[in-house]
């Protein structure tokens, strides 16, 4: 079974393992015992309707959530207890396979909880979540510390019979065993008790961190007519309050980026910059620094309890990087070139500011503004001109075209009202095999920013595919925070936001292309799972997309060849800034999780560490520590934010495989290998082995340096 994030799921990891479609479940494989869910709570009900059943988003009522969580936890624990106390000797079928079907009510519930957490958050939900976090942590700990269950898993792993199983099934067993062992299943009684205490407190802290940052993200800045200098008309229209001459700037990246790029009001640029980068760092009730210090201390203690020198060593053991040293070495290979390039970029910007007699020294709130001037001067490339050809609806259709050519998928809007949605903004498409018409899954899109929706962009899998107990198809969503345009107006996006749109669609395609037999292998290794999404960004400015979909929103004319050429020549423009802001966050994440954090002051540590590394004063970390939700609102990316760079080595190398092929980025042979080896298997194959099967060798790190313009 697949788990989503109610707290951070040890239960989630519990069943996160399994083989691909082609490996049929044995005929005598038992199903999990019927869940003792006896209430009529709609959040626990089996999904009904078309497409193999869909979430009942139209029946979501927060009043049902708290009792549903408690009932689902009890049901899952009861199911696992039946497996643990089975009088028959442990086998792959009656233990590992049986666990795959346990907790389905919790799976369904976590989809709704995820919506309330990320898409429709309210103070009431956040209060409820805080109340439930310790209970959920105790539930997860009870699973991991079920000695009888772990003994059965261990017996299956040590059984001579395992050697006769397929490689996929062996991997499934190993992953399930490792999940338990790495979460303290082998600790003594005192160790288990302390582990449970740490888990319970971390659950509270992660939840509180996310709530505090979200509260700061709900702050806005009101602008008057005198504050709009330099802003594009489309942006002004998007943020204008309809009933007054007031423009409201949300505290989101999708609003901050264009404001800092175009606003001629330097004082306001600084205000907007400080508001965005000070989230969680105002010294008020929403300040997160004390939470971070405690989170780091507890993670460090837990790692020591499990026998590791620090949290990062524990976290990276089963990643592609394997050790913090290897992850750090990759980042430090890129860092000198990145900060050297920043110096060149700042010099070019300062030259323009001096020529304009601006009387300033470039500061962080000036970087985007003057970088845009450099872009226009060097490449005669105006990013707002590019934006006129990047219409969200057309970009969506372009993604569908790419998915058709590479994956053989077709996307068709579902009939209005046939699939429940949780907000009127959400639209749904059916995904089919273009050649056979066979149903593959559903794709949901929630594109617009609104109060209660977390910032950024992300993909969510509501249901992963598997075949071990009958074919189950995928339900996956993409979520963005575009500012909704006035009715009847097109939504124009920046090139960066268009790239992110493609990126998140890559995650969706990874889910849709899965061919695993057991849902447990639908998971992934963190420093590998960003590879597929980062790779899909490369198709945004391919000829097929440019010629067919990047058309001027008013004239319908295709993007001029001269503009295309400027975009390609400027492909590595501002790479110093983008690489440095990312590496600042990734290196800080790793550093925080390798030191002994006793007595740490996160703000002071951030300042001192950046100074030690020679962080340019004109660039700030992409995610400063006080609002680094990837790392502190849960453990998904903790000690793992480097994974984007690790994945980008694979991305750059794989992109060269397409560039070298006769058919370029749409070469059918390379596309077939891509899907077969790097998308469809999910976690059924070790990522390093999967990449070698695709490329015939390991990825070349120099491909990354070439790609970023850092090659010698």
What do the predicted segments below correspond to?
Residues 172, 204, 211, 215-250, ...:
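Active-site-proximal, well-structured secondary-structure segments within enzyme catalytic domains
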Residues 13, 24-26, 30-235, 247-248, ...:
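N-terminal helix-rich structural modules
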Residues 18-20:
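Bacterial signal peptide processing site
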Residues 29-64, 71, 230, 234, ...:
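C-terminal, non-catalytic "cap/extension" segments appended to globular domains
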Residues 5-16:
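Bacterial N-terminal signal peptides
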Residues 483-502:
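Short pre-active-site segment immediately N-terminal to the catalytic Zn-binding motif
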Residues 49-66, 113-132, 155-197, 250-290, ...:
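Short His/Asp/Glu-rich catalytic/ion-coordination signatures at enzyme active sites or charged loops
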Residues 63, 67-85, 97, 101-104, ...:
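A broad, structural surface signal
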């Amino acid at each position: 079974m697949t788990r989503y994030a109610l707290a951070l799921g040890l239960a989630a990891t519990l069943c996160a393992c399994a083989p691909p479609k082609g490996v049929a479940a044995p005929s005598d494989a038992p199903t999990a015992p019927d869940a003792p869910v006896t209430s009529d709570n709609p959040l626990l009900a089996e999904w009904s309707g078309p497409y193999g059943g869909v979430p009942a988003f139209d029946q979501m009522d927060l009043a049902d959530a708290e009792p549903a969580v408690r009932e689902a936890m009890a049901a899952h624990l009861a199911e696992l207890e039946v497996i643990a106390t089975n009088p028959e000797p442990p086998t792959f079928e009656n233990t590992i396979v049986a666990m795959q079907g346990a907790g389905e009510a919790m799976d369904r519930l976590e989809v709704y909880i995820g919506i309330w957490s990320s898409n429709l958050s309210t103070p009431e939900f956040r209060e409820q979540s805080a109340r439930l976090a310790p209970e959920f942590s105790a539930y997860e700990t009870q699973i991991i510390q079920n000695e009888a269950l772990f003994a059965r898993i261990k017996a299956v792993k040590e059984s001579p019979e395992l050697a006769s199983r397929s490689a996929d099934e062996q991997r499934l067993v190993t992953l399930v065993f490792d999940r338990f062992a790495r979460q303290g299943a082998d600790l003594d009684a005192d160790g288990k008790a302390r582990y449970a205490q740490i888990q319970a407190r971390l659950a509270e802290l992660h939840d509180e961190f996310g709530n505090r940052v979200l509260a700061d993200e709900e702050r806005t800045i009101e602008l008057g007519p005198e504050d709009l200098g330099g802003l594009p008309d489309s942006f002004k229209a998007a943020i204008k309050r309809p009933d007054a001459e007031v423009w409201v700037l949300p505290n989101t990246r999708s609003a901050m980026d264009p404001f800092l790029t175009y606003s001629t009001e330097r004082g306001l640029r600084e205000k907007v910059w400080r508001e965005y980068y000070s989230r969680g760092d105002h010294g008020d009730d929403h300040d997160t620094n004390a939470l971070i210090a405690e989170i780091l201390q507890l993670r460090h203690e837990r790692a020591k309890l499990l026998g590791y020198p620090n949290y990062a060593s524990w976290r990276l053991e089963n990643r592609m990087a394997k050790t913090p040293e290897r992850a750090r070495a990759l980042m430090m290979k890129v860092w000198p070139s990145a900060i050297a390039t920043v110096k060149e970029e700042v010099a070019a910007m300062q030259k323009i500011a001096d020529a304009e007699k601006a009387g300033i020294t470039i500061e962080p709130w000036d970087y985007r503004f003057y970088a845009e001037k450099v872009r226009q001067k060097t490449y005669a490339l105006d990013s707002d001109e590019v934006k006129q050809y990047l219409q969200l609806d057309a970009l969506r259709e372009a993604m569908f075209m790419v998915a058709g050519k590479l994956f053989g998928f077709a996307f068709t809007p579902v009939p209005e009202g046939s699939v429940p949605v949780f907000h009127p903004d959400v639209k749904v498409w059916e995904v089919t095999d273009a050649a056979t018409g066979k149903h593959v899954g559903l794709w949901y899109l929630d594109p617009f920013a609104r109060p209660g929706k977390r910032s950024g962009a992300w993909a969510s899998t509501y249901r992963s595919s598997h075949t071990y107990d009958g074919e189950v198809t995928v339900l996956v969503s993409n979520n963005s925070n575009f500012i909704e345009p006035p009715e009847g107006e097109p939504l124009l996006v920046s090139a960066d936001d268009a790239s992110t749109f493609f990126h998140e669609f890559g995650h969706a395609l990874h889910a849709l292309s899965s061919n695993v037999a057991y849902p447990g292998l639908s998971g992934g290794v963190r420093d590998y799972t960003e590879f597929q999404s980062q790779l899909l960004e490369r198709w945004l400015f391919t000829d097929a997309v440019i010629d067919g979909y990047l058309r001027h929103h008013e004239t319908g004319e295709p993007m001029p060849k001269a503009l295309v050429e400027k975009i390609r020549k400027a492909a590595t423009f501002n790479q110093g800034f983008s690489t440095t802001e990312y590496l600042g966050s990734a290196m800080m994440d790793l550093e925080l999780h390798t030191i002994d954090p006793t007595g740490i002051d996160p703000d002071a540590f951030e300042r001192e560490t950046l100074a030690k590394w020679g962080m340019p004063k004109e660039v700030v970390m992409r995610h400063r520590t006080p609002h680094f939700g990837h790392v502190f609102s849960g453990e998904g990316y903790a000690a793992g934010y480097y994974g984007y760079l690790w994945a980008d080595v694979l991305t750059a190398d794989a992109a060269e495989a397409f560039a070298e092929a006769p058919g370029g980025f749409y070469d059918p042979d390379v596309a077939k290998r891509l899907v077969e080896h790097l998308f469809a298997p999910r976690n059924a194959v070790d990522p390093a082995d999967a990449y070698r099967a695709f490329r015939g060798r390991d990825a070349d790190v120099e491909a990354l340096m070439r790609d970023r313009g850092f090659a010698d």
